[in-house]
């Protein structure tokens, strides 16, 4: 397996890195574009014709009638290669860290340990070397030539003093690192924080402990939402008794048998939808 594996010298695992590896480039009147027509052969023998507009920065999309080109790491040679195979030959954590920056895959959190007792984290995959990621369109005149280069100077952690590393399938990094490598989105940190808390509950771990950690479904993150919903429903106990009963017996877990968990999760989702729906509607109008 590639996502998790071992060569008996090191063991590794990957989770999504959520780094910013794309910029929208605002094209100007002098920007050269051209159309490419492609034919996609389908399994049933039919052919789907597809046309797209390209530029020197990447494929072009019109937003509010203005052309923007998507400059994306996946379109760069450094982001697609077979360097990942070198991980199989690594004998130590240091070997794996040395390989990480050269590997051409979508950016992942590399977690690696070795038989000598070392452990480390580093972002593995193609990252553009441009120094200022932007959440807004970048003027074509300000396009950085560093987009053509892979970022070799990237943060890593090896053998932390507290003896613990975790990712939880989410973005990892300091506030300073985030200013350089974000914002490529993020996964909610609830899972990461719960893994962190579990790791600090013990000083020694067996394989079964890590397996139990993977199966940990305690709904810690939703506990405040559970309390809030229960408070609201208890304002009319007669009308809401069946829901109150479900919440009082929710088992505090993401269990298939927990009706209360489903109520709390959907309650949180609905509150967020109500609060942000007007903003989302306005953004959709602006995007046409």
Protein language model features and the residues they cover:
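Mature extracytoplasmic enzyme cores
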Residues: 1-241, 245-254
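A terminal-accessory region detector
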Residues: 237-288
């Amino acid at each position: 397996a590639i996502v998790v594996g071992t060569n008996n010298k090191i063991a590794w695992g990957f989770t999504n890195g959520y780094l910013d590896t794309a910029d929208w480039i605002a094209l100007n009147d002098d920007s050269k574009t051209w159309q490419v027509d492609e034919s996609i052969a389908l399994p049933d023998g039919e052919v789907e014709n597809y046309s797209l507009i390209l530029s020197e920065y990447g494929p072009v999309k019109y937003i509010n009638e203005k052309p923007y080109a998507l400059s994306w790491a996946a379109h760069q040679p450094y982001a697609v290669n077979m360097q990942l195979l070198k991980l199989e030959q690594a004998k130590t954590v240091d070997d794996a860290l040395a390989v990480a920056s050269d590997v051409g895959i979508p950016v992942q959190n590399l977690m690696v340990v070795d038989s000598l007792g070392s452990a480390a984290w580093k972002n593995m995959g193609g990252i553009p070397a441009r120094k200022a990621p932007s959440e807004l369109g970048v003027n074509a005149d300000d396009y950085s030539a560093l987009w053509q280069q892979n970022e070799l100077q990237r943060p890593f952690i090896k053998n932390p003093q507290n003896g613990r590393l975790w990712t939880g399938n989410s973005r990892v990094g300091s506030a300073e690192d985030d200013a350089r490598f974000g914002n490529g989105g993020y996964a909610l940190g609830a899972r990461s924080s719960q893994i962190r808390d579990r790791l600090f509950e013990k000083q020694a771990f067996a394989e079964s402990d890590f397996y139990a950690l993977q199966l940990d479904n305690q709904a810690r993150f939703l506990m405040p939402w559970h309390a809030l919903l229960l408070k609201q429903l208890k304002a009319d106990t007669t009308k809401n008794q069946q829901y109150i009963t479900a919440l009082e017996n929710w088992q505090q877990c993401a269990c298939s048998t927990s009706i209360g968990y489903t109520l709390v999760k959907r309650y949180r989702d609905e509150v967020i939808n109500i609060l942000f729906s007007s903003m989302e509607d306005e953004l959709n109008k602006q995007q046409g």
